[in-house]
Amino acid sequence: AIEKAVDALEPDLILCHHLYLLTAMARERFKEQKIYGFCHNTDLRQMKKTGLWRDYIREQIRGLDAIFVPQSAQKEGVMEIFGIGAGKIRILGMGYSQEIFCGPEKPDNAARGKDGAIRLIYAGKIAEKKGVKSLIKSLSYLPYPRDGLKLSLAGGAGNKTEYQEIEELALKAPYPVEFLGKLPQPELAKEYQRSDIFVLPSFFDGLPLTVIEAIACGDKVVVTDLPGIQDWLKEQAPGAVVKYVPLPVMRNTDEAVSESLPAFEKQLAAKIEECAREEGQRRVDLSHLSWKNICKEILKSS
C-alpha cells in the first residue's frame, strides 16, 4: 500500500508517525526519499518494553532525515533509545483543531449548567493505566454533597474485562459517573464546554493532546506530573489553570505499584478540590498550536 501511494503521488516528503516498525520499513524501502518521523511517546514505551525487531528499528530510525517530538522529555528519550544526535531532533509540540476546540460563543450561557454541580470530565481510553480506576476511587475523598459533582468519561474500552471493572467501580462511586463512549471531535468539544475541570490521571503519556483541547474549550485542568509537561505548558499555555499530581511509584515504564495508589488517589482528590476553588479558566491563546502553524513549522525544516 505504501509503495502504491509513493508511486502514484511521487511525494517530495514522506511524513511517518510513530518511531516504530512501519516507519523503519518505510526508511529501508525508500532510501532516496526525504522522510520525517514523528514521536508520540508510546513508541518509546514500545522500544523499552518489547524486543520485537528492536535493533532493526533502531538502525532504520537513525536514518530518518529529521525527527519531531512533542517536548524535551521525548527528545531525551529519542536520543537515549535510538542513539540519535540532538541536531536531528526538533521539538514541535502538539497540534489541535482550533476550529473545533474553542470556548462556547457565550461563555456565561447555560453550557456549564445552572445546578451548581462541579463537572469533571476525562477523555481517553477507559483503562487502568490511564488512571481511570484511580480517578473514580479519588471521588471518595471529595467533600461535596452527592448532587454537588458529576464525572463524565469519554472514550472507548481498551480491555473489556477492565472496562467492566471500571463500570462496577463507577456504580459504587459517591457521585454520578457517566460513560459517554467514544465521541466525534465536535461532540467531545461540546462536552469540554459543558465541564469545569478536565482530569487526566494517566500513568504514562507524552504530551497529551486532550489537555490542550480542554484548555482551549475553557476547562481548568488536573493532570499527573508527566515528564516535561509542567515546563511545556508554562511556556505554551501561560496563565492556564493547571494543577499537577505527583505520579505514583512506577515499574515497567507504565505500571503503577498498587501499594502507592491510595496516597496517589488522595493527592488527586486534593488537586481536584484545589482546582475547583479557582476561578474559571482564563482565556488562553493557543493559536500557535493550531495544525496550520504546526504544519508551517514542519515545512520550515524541509
Predicted regions and their residues:
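Short hydrophobic beta-strand element within catalytic cores of glycosyltransferases
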Residues: 220-223, 230, 234, 240-241
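Short alpha-helical donor nucleotide-sugar binding micro-motif in glycosyltransferases
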Residues: 182-183, 190-195
